[in-house]
Regions:
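Generic beta-strand structural signal
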Residues: 13, 107-112, 178-180, 197, 201-202, 253, ...
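Conserved anion/nucleotide-ligand pocket segment
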Residues: 112-164
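Conserved N-proximal alpha/beta basic substrate-recognition cap immediately N-terminal to
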Residues: 2-134
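Phosphate-binding site of ATP-dependent enzymes
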Residues: 143-239
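Short beta-strand-to-turn element immediately C-terminal to the catalytic PLP-Schiff-base lysine
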Residues: 127-130, 202, 261
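A long amphipathic alpha-helix within ATP-dependent nucleotide-binding catalytic cores
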Residues: 183-185, 208-260, 264, 268-296
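Short catalytic/ligand-binding loop motif for oxyanion handling, primarily in non-cytosolic enzymes
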Residues: 69-72, 94-95, 120-124, 191-193, ...
């Protein structure tokens, strides 16, 4: 298992974390929360920057705008800083990096999983939408449940809405045109459970975490391994394509073949992370040294 190594003080270092102007979740539920705690423990000042209205002197800025497509104003704001993490990671929609997606006319006939093209079912985007009235939200929830009960296809709003079909032909045609993506369902299995491999990274710190669980869709399970190591070449290629300095990529290795499932640049956690997550965050946080020691951009 991974262990945090002793690192030098970050005294006098100012680290900024850039969030969307309407973000209601700053650190709770994100890996950046316990990582920031570790930076502070090493003496750094960590500053949350909400929106692009105010600029403060920083040594490093981490772009943490939790949208599948980052608005241009945030990239412009970020590039004015000397060292920027995830400056060029501006589009993580699944169509931008998954090469095995199935189209309506493709001959593929095996099991498929229907996902949202947006990260996490588009939930981060909806968090930034103006909130409707309480009665309106209740009515919309009831309508969604009724539509499902009578078999009508509804939009994918959460990861729990992802659906597995045993044949491509059983996918409702609307799913090929409504912002969904259809990927062959090729999970890695172990003793009847589903295996999820996670590649966490910040700079030159790379962590491979493996979980097993009974749910084929939701990515929470029992941790069976967590080591510092390099990922398979196919996984690193996705990181390079998305130009990610910090993030997480989910994948599996069914029958020895590497299959990428998902990528994220604003890594989430539970609101009260357990010891395993805190240890992972502590080791991952040390990747900030890559930027502290680098030459500032002109």
């Amino acid at each position: 298992m991974i262990e945090e190594s002793r690192r030098p003080s970050l005294g006098d270092v100012r680290i900024g974390v850039l969030h969307h102007a309407r973000s209601s979740l700053i650190r709770s539920g994100y890996m950046i929360g316990p990582m920031s705690d570790r930076w502070r423990a090493r003496g750094a000042e960590v500053i949350d920057i909400i929106g692009t209205g105010t600029s403060v002197p920083l040594d490093v800025l981490l772009c943490h705008v939790d949208l599948s497509v980052v608005p241009e104003e945030y990239r412009r704001f970020a590039q004015n800083h000397p060292r920027v993490i995830n400056l060029s990671a501006t589009d993580i929609r699944k169509r931008s990096y998954l090469d095995d997606l199935v189209g309506i006319d493709d001959p593929y006939s095996g099991p498929v999983i229907v996902k949202s093209n947006l990260n996490h079912g588009g939930f981060p985007e909806r968090l930034l939408e103006p909130r409707g009235s309480g009665l309106g939200r209740i009515a919309n929830g009831i309508l969604r449940r009724l539509r499902r009960r009578i078999g009508m296809v509804d939009e994918i709003r959460y990861k729990s809405d992802y659906v597995i079909h045993q044949e491509r032909s059983s996918v409702p045609p609307v799913r090929f045109h409504d912002g969904s993506v259809i990927q062959p369902f090729r999970p890695e299995r172990q003793d009847g459970n589903f295996v999820l491999r996670e590649y966490y990274f910040l700079g030159d710190i790379e962590i491979l975490n493996t979980e097993v669980g009974s749910d084929p869709v939701l990515t929470t399970g029992r941790q069976v391994e967590c080591i510092q190591d390099s990922p398979p070449a196919e996984v690193r290629a996705i990181r390079d394509r998305l130009r990610l300095d910090y993030g997480k990529i989910d994948y599996g290795c069914p029958d020895g073949e590497v299959i990428v499932y998902d990528a994220n640049k604003c890594v989430g956690t539970r609101s009260n992370p357990g010891e395993a997550v805190l240890k992972l965050a502590a080791v991952l946080s040390q990747g900030i040294d890559t930027w502290i020691e680098s030459t500032p951009s002109s």
